[in-house]
Amino acid sequence: LSKRNAVPGWRRALGWFTRIFRSDDVASRVTRASAGAQRPVTTGRRLVVLGASGGTGTTSVAVGLARTLAAVRNAPTALVAIDDNDDLSSRLDVAPVPPARSDLPATDFAAQMSAMTESGRIAAIRPHEDAAAMARGLGRFFAVTVIDAGQHPPAQLTSEAHAVVIVASASAAGTTAVTRTVAGLHAARTNPKTILVVLVPRLPGDEVTRHAQHLRASGITTFVLPHDRHIAGGAALHLRLAAENTQVILGELAAATMNPPDR
């Protein structure tokens, strides 16, 4: 499954052929997303990815976002995983990542990397006790730290984040869960302008537009990932095997997370 392309070969060839003869905005979207994701940062940015409910694909989005930022910025990206489950190791194709011995940053970059598990340009780690402290410390060495925060991240982590990405199913229940999660973030003093939503369809052909429009009408920036059989497979996530539209949406999400919100 890890090597299964999201789009069959005949469809990729047909898509390439038809794009020659029609005008689409894929190239311009990729260019804009790439420019946005490459914005320079003065301090390490912390991007929290959380699930509005269980089984929404939070780890998949966190890994996809981290891989996209690492590729576009051409630099290592830190990935902090709060929950102790096997999703991260399978998505990164690495051995289970044990908790760190300390949440404090190392004395230098080499020492920090030796305490982390590498998968391509992603360096993964689990906090010892304090995820917020670890995320702050990693900012000494990494321009971007993505935190796979599960469903119930610490309030300090989300209030200090430069972006909070809520992952939900593209359904009525999903939008309700998003509304509830956003209310909880507001109560925890999370900056509303840092909040982004990613809707993930459970099956091919699921109606997603109506649910996305509902959230956007509420003032919530919302992205919709297409159903992608490579990501849905549950194995190691490789951007090159994802569908073109999946890659574009992840790029646009990456650009949005790097856009500094008004404080």
Give short role names for the model-derived ranges.
Residues 161-179, 204:
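Conserved Switch II/interswitch segment of TRAFAC-class P-loop GTPases
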